[in-house]
């Protein structure tokens, strides 16, 4: 399957059309951003690591009965995916307090959240992805009530699967975001799952093993990503 025209260039991925109108090529670049794209740097191997990491996670979720857009890997940095009509709202699950939640509520980082919190954010970099709720989604027509309920159900199901997967690898799944779209009327998981869009801490040391290493200038970003991948059993080379 050959990529054709560039359709969209995001902060870390590029989307291309193919000869099949139902399929796209997703290319993972070495770019890393923070502050809604205000700060961007390149890291060798990052595109490859995230592409293979994402394929591994999507495969595990598909095995658990969660529909995903993933078709197959095409190269070290590219995969073939179904073309989705993306919902402009992302789902976030929080198992522990971190990031914007800590700032917003003034609570201690790392406290366990039981049951996990479920948040919705409008995907809009210019507005810094404002937090919204189910009522906004219905009023503005971003997603139907039925499809939003399905997105929430699949997000919690993914959390159950991934918490155990990471726990078995000696990692805490602190929080993560998921994006969904519609494929022939069905709610399907799209975009990616990688350390770019999740928070992962070492169970013993609480060392941060995700993009917070870049956001907080901790260093060792790719080393952390590769360490997480190795613990999970992702084949990188």
Swiss-Prot record:
GO molecular function: ATP binding; guanosine tetraphosphate binding; phosphoribosylaminoimidazolesuccinocarboxamide synthase activity
Catalytically driven reaction(s): 5-amino-1-(5-phospho-D-ribosyl)imidazole-4-carboxylate + L-aspartate + ATP = (2S)-2-[5-amino-1-(5-phospho-beta-D-ribosyl)imidazole-4-carboxamido]succinate + ADP + phosphate + 2 H(+)
Top-level taxon of origin: Bacteria
Coiled-coil intervals, chain numbering: none
Pathway in which the depicted protein is active: Purine metabolism; IMP biosynthesis via de novo pathway; 5-amino-1-(5-phospho-D-ribosyl)imidazole-4-carboxamide from 5-amino-1-(5-phospho-D-ribosyl)imidazole-4-carboxylate: step 1/2
Pfam family, any one: SAICAR_synt
One Gene Ontology cellular component: cytosol
Enzyme class: ligase
Record's function text: Converts 4-carboxy-5-aminoimidazole ribonucleotide (CAIR) to 4-(N-succinylcarboxamide)-5-aminoimidazole ribonucleotide (SAICAR).
Similarity comment: Belongs to the SAICAR synthetase family.
Assembly behavior: Homotrimer.
UniProt-recorded name of the protein: Phosphoribosylaminoimidazole-succinocarboxamide synthase
Gene: purC
């Amino acid at each position: 399957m050959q990529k054709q025209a560039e359709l969209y260039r995001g902060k870390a991925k590029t989307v291309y059309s193919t000869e099949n109108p139902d399929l796209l090529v997703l290319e993972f670049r070495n770019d890393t951003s923070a502050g809604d794209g205000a700060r961007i740097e390149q890291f060798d191997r990052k595109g490859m690591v995230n592409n293979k990491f994402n394929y591994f996670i999507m495969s595990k979720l598909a095995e658990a009965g969660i529909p995903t857009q993933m078709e197959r890997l095409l190269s070290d940095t590219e995969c073939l995916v179904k073309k989705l009509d993306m919902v402009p709202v992302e789902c976030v699950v929080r198992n522990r307090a971190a990031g914007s939640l800590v700032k917003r509520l003034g609570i201690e980082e790392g406290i366990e959240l039981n049951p996990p919190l479920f948040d919705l954010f409008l995907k809009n970099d210019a507005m810094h992805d404002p937090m919204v709720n189910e009522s906004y989604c219905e009023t503005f027509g971003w997603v139907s009530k039925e499809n939003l309920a399905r997105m929430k159900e699949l997000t919690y199901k993914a959390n159950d699967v991934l918490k155990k997967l990471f726990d078995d690898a000696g990692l805490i799944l602190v929080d993560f975001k998921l994006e969904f779209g519609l494929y022939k009327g069905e709610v399907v998981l799209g975009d990616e799952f990688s350390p770019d869009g999740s928070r992962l801490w070492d169970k013993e040391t609480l060392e941060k093993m995700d993009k917070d290493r870049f956001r907080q200038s901790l260093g060792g970003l790719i080393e952390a990503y590769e360490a997480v991948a190795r613990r999970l059993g992702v084949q990188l080379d």
